């Protein structure tokens, strides 16, 4: 009995230490955010920037590879500046398509700075939740072929799923994070995750975290296992999501994107590095919204859905001293929520094919133009526009337009502008704190792309007007 009490006290002490450590870090970040929105912002930002460059040194981009089309030179300047100012600590690449034409393709830095391994055209990297957009494409292909409908109940293709209040959950609810299956009660091992039958039993028996259809909450990890179930049970050949994508997309169109990387290719993968405390403070000072990302898991109650997601599975860890996403065992796993491995040029080409109607019909693509769900997300507790497996960003040039795609942890992002036919893919192994437009490097690159596009469009309009006037004269 005494031993059990001692064990309980030790566990409680560990929890207190964990909470205390998180609180101290958040206090530092909180002070940084207060300074960021105060009149002292410019002085603080300049001081932090100088300190970061002094301590960690500037990154001299001496291995830039790629090109930009005429009129898009500003994108290259921003790409170089991201390194020179220390925002890119390791390596990065960006590829942009305008319809079926590459207008930007840049890469450089380090695949592994600690070992001196440079980023090359063959370097691949983990793109985290950007992988979810690829899962959404696979489901869209099966919908377009008539094998399933978004309105179908999941129990139509998976009768065992109709347990514990899940009988009315549709494929649409699952893809738009409305099913209430964001966190699992049963601890998941790596062996479980690689066992389709086991994960089938776990998800089928899981009781929803909230009444399905009433809320939307980000299914950060479970999305991958759920999409795998949808694909396996609707594909006439019964293939896993990784095999379906490889055979129907990657092999057919020559796309180097892996949902389950062959171990023989592990040497091509960049090493991911976490931001230091100094970099975290720097991000907050320049954009206090980053603090929200930190607060999602650090300030939520222990029994919150966000904490449950972070705790299970235990082998998914992104911390200062532990980053399991560098583990080759995980790289080989078919997990379409977080473990896609690719290059920016292949990621961009994949979604340019989507825009061209090469993977599923443009009629179906039109349904993805705007989010199905907006408002506060039940898990991350911030607005998270989403739908059909994609996340959305407001177009940086204003108006009511959306960019559709998916950001990933640390900055990796793919986004499509369906109106102008622009596809942007950005990947990086020096992880940042935010996602999507909260990632400074990506946001500045994205904005520069659309600024250049607007100038191109304005120039074309002037030329057309001058030509019309010349004909009239």
Curated annotation (Swiss-Prot):
SUPFAM superfamilies: beta-lactamase/transpeptidase-like. Pfam families: Beta-lactamase. The keyword Iron does not apply. It is a multi-pass membrane protein. It is found in: Membrane. It comes from the Eukaryota. Its main location: membrane. The chain crosses the membrane at residues 26-48, 125-143. The keyword Nucleus does not apply. Keywords: Membrane, Transmembrane, Transmembrane helix. GO terms for cellular component: membrane. InterPro entries: Beta-lactam-related (IPR001466), Beta-lactam/transpept-like (IPR012338), Beta-lactamase/esterase (IPR052907). This is Beta-lactamase domain-containing protein 2.
């Amino acid at each position: 009995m005494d031993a059990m009490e001692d064990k309980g006290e030790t566990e409680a002490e560990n929890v207190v230490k964990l909470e205390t450590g998180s609180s101290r870090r958040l206090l530092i970040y909180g002070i940084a955010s207060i300074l960021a929105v105060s009149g002292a912002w410019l002085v603080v930002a300049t001081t932090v920037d100088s300190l970061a460059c002094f301590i960690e040194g500037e990154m001299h981009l001496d291995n830039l590879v790629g090109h930009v089309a005429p009129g898009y030179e500003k994108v290259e300047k921003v790409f170089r500046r991201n390194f020179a100012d220390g925002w890119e600590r390791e390596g990065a690449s960006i590829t942009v398509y305008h319809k079926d034409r590459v207008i930007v393709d840049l890469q450089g830095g380090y695949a592994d700075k600690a070992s001196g391994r440079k980023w090359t055209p063959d370097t691949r990297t983990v793109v985290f939740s950007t992988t979810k957009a690829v899962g959404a494409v696979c489901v869209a292909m099966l919908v377009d072929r008539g094998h399933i409908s978004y309105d179908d109940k999941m129990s139509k293709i998976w009768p065992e799923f109709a347990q514990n209040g899940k009988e009315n959950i549709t494929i649409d609810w699952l893809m738009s994070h409305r099913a209430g299956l964001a966190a699992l009660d049963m601890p998941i091992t790596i062996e479980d995750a690689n066992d389709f039958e086991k994960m089938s039993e776990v998800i089928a028996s899981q009781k929803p975290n909230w009444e399905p259809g009433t809320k939307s909450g980000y299914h950060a990890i479970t999305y991958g296992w759920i999409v795998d179930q949808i694909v396996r049970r609707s594909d006439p050949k019964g293939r896993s999501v990784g095999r379906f994508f490889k055979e129907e997309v990657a092999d057919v169109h020559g796309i180097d994107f892996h949902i389950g990387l062959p171990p023989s290719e592990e040497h091509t993968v960049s090493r991911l590095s976490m931001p230091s405390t100094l970099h975290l403070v720097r991000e907050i000072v320049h954009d206090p919204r980053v603090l929200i990302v930190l607060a999602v898991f650090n300030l939520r109650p222990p029994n919150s859905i966000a904490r449950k997601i972070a705790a299970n599975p235990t082998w998914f860890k992104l911390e200062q001293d532990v980053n399991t996403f560098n583990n080759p065992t995980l790289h080989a796993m078919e997990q379409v929520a977080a473990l896609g491995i690719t290059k920016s040029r292949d990621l961009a080409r994949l979604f340019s094919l989507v825009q061209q109607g090469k993977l599923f019909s443009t009629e179906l693509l039109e349904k993805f133009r705007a989010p199905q769900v907006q408002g506060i997300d039940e898990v991350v507790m911030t607005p998270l526009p989403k739908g059909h497996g994609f996340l959305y960003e407001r177009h940086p040039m204003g108006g009511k337009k959306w960019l559709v795609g998916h950001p990933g942890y640390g900055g990796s992002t793919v986004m499509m502008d369906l109106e102008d036919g622009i596809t942007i893919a950005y990947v990086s192994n020096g992880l940042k704190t935010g996602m999507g437009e909260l990632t400074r490097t990506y946001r500045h690159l994205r904005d520069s792309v659309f600024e250049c596009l607007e100038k191109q469009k304005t120039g074309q309009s002037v030329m057309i007007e001058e030509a019309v006037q010349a004909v009239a004269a």
